[in-house]
Amino acid sequence: MSATTVSQFAVELKMPVVALLEQLGKAGVGKSDANDMLNDQDKTRLLDYLRRAHGDESQTKITLTRKQTSEIKATDSHGRARTVQVEVRKKRVLVKRDIGEHAPEVELEASNALQEEVSAPEVIPEPVVEVVPEPVIEVVPEPVVEIVPEPVVEAPVEVPVEEVVLEKAAPVAPTRASIIGEKELQARAEESRRYNQLREIQERELREKQAREAQLVQMRQQAELAAAAAKAAELAKNQAATQAKTSEGAEKGTLHKKPETPGKKGDKGGRAADDGKKKGGIKTRGSDGAGGWKDNRHGHKKSHKVDDGQGSFQAPTEPVVREVHIPETISVSDLAHKMAIKATEIIKVMMKMGSMVTINQVLDQETAMIVVEEMGHQALAAKLDDPDAFLEEHAEHKDVPLEHRAPVVTVMGHVDHGKTSLLDYIRRAKVASGEAGGITQHIGAYHVETDRGMVTFLDTPGHEAFTAMRARGAKATDIVILVVAADDGVMPQTKEAIHHAKAAGVPLVVAVNKIDKPDANPERVKQELVAEGVIPEEYGGDSPFVPVSAKKGTGIDELLEQVLLQAEILELTAQKDAPAKGLIIEARLDKGRGAVATMLVQSGTLKRGDIVLAGQVFGRVRAMLDENGKPINEAGPSIPVEILGLSDVPAAGEEAIVLGDEKKAREIALFRQGKFRDVKLAKQQAAKLENMFQQMEEGEVKTLPLIVKADVQGSQEALVQTLSKLSNEEVRVQIIHGAVGAISESDVNLAQASGAVIIGFNIRADAGSRKLAESFGVDIRYYNVIYDAVDEVKAALSGMLSPEKREQITGMVEIRQVFLVSKVGAIAGCYVLEGFVKRNSRVRLLRNNVVQWDGELDSLKRFKDDVKEVRSNFECGLSLRGNNDIQVGDQLEVYEIQEVARSL
């Protein structure tokens, strides 16, 4: 023991400090303050004093011992039922002391000592609480102690054996470990009461379970009796029919055959049914296990009774028709869970419908609904908690007045017809020279202040690869200027631009460019456009034709006048003092500034700090730049701006909207990302399964893996689409990855892992990426013009094509004499009629102009000397490899197979 203070020792003994100081004083330990220290010697003196104060006379101890044996049923880890013998032993010790004559009354509280020893052969039953008797002693100054025994707490079970032993008890030495409080006694009594309640609940549940099992057995027996009666009636009927057949057979003199019974050779279905009855049900936990398939405890063989009736009792059930809510995409396992069936059942049904699926495959909504209806359930299209519904509620502010806005004009036409040059003259800036190859490869958006008002121009590419970009331009525009070269006429992209404008319902203004050239023919252009459905105003149509020259500036003012006249007719208006809405015209990834998107504001006012949601991307507008790169704070309707601060590069053509809540914008963006990923995965898996067998039949297709990186989203999209169109049945372009931004080290690692070639369009790789590519041997190609990229990829695909084999006849030989040599075989003496014959050439043996054999020459000689070739009008001797069937008059057609390179 360590030294403690008087107050700490009083807390340990659970008694007042004043009482402890009095006892210490009577024990000869001089302590007067609660903070005085007590050492081991002081504590020993106090203990000796207390022992002397209690005395040794007339102490008796009563010991009660009780035993009880019971049985419980439990299951082991294998589910087998076991009967376990449980023996409960309880022991109580009661101590009684005499009362002194002059001493005050002191109560010695003795708790009930419960010592339960449970002996179980294999399984440990429910835990039994052990209670150790610890008498509580309240010390008083007088040495005489009065002991009053506490009432004994009865056990929850009857006591079959009880022994009472009276003996002289040894002096009880009160120690700190033997002191117990009244709260502890109450807690133990409460615990004993709960144990009794738990035991009663378990016994009641056991009785109810046995009653249910007895009821099920009775119902099963009744069903078996009914089945036996039905079978007996059927058997009697069959016997009567058999006797009738036997009598007929006896008259005809035939042998009698026993009728086939269920379970015999002729009835396989009956045998399968009986086998199912023999196995029965597997016993589970909680059952008694009697008669189970693993109940053979003593190693004896146990014969199972086979019920020859109609089977065990089964409650009649009718098919459950469920309402299954199908989202846009759902996996096979989730669909099976919704219908409460196994996934293999769905796989079987879809195999019958002609689709091979796996348990984790994602199905689209239409396919899943067909499967659900095929299986007899009711399919409903699920109405998810779509955050996009918030955008529908986020309608235009009707109280904001509409104001006049500038027209958005898109310049469209064929490549090299002068679209950008026309805009340059209007903007008084030479932009075409900055484009690689002099062709526009991404959308340029500008707004121009003219004398008649402001006009916003969108310049679209004319190359065939940029179809999607032209479609986006027509979608975002109010008026289309169709530029047609007077010396070139209507070309394929001109027709496509007309179709885009008509599909968008946008008026056309035709600018006949390059009228200053000597070979210009504007009248031919008009006739060709009339054939395409574009009627000039002078012919009674609604499309004004303006002859212009982008080089000299002729007709530019008339063109702008026609554009503004069309805008006045359209009466273009938009809300200005409202949250902005617009269209993402172009997007790219800038190394220093991150995601940069060109946005055309269509209504409202876009300000710095607004929360913008564009498709699957959202973000706060950190900065806004105009088309000249100057920072601005706000942009109204029909103004194109570059915005910075989006979380990722948005897809070109996405609708952009300003929201007031960043949390809602993030929620909608994440929802769209998950939805897009699920739909894309479903399409990929469907395409894989549809093409799997076709690829197995056609053989392996050679693939050219590519990684495409471009400066802007539109150029990357156009390049991917154009390169994908180069694929055919033998070679295929596989786009491993396509993105905007510089070539990074992750792109090089991906190319090294997939064996791909990196194509950089208007971008370059940094120093680290170049070194990594050199170490890995990754090929990086840089292009500034889309023509060059397409031509080189086409050449690479042509090299991957297997060469074409062509057959060329080189000579004709006539057999004039045949010699038979024992070791060699048949030798033909021949005359070369035309051409030449070489050693090891391939020949065809012709007899009466019918091919008899096709093979190779074995040897070629002239005057007993081996020669390499023999030309026309010369004689030679030859033998055929593996063929001796030659005759005089046969002809040999000599030919060779040449491989010719193919091209796309």
From Swiss-Prot:
The segment annotated G4 runs over 513-516
Stretches the record annotates as G2: 438-442
tr-type G domain sequence ranges? 404-571
Q: What is its main location?
A: cytoplasm
Q: Where is this region: G1?
A: 413-420
Alphabetical keyword list: Cytoplasm, GTP-binding, Initiation factor, Nucleotide-binding, Protein biosynthesis
UniProt binding sites for GTP:
413-420, 459-463, 513-516
InterPro entries given for it? DNA-bd_dom_put_sf, EF-G-like_DII, EFTu-like_2, IF2_assoc_dom_bac, IF2_II, IF2_N, P-loop_NTPase, Small_GTP-bd
Region described as Disordered = 239-316
Bias (Basic and acidic residues): 248-278
Q: Which GO molecular-function terms appear in the entry? A: GTP binding; GTPase activity; guanosine tetraphosphate binding; translation initiation factor activity
* Protein's name according to its UniProt entry: Translation initiation factor IF-2
Gene name of the encoded protein: infB
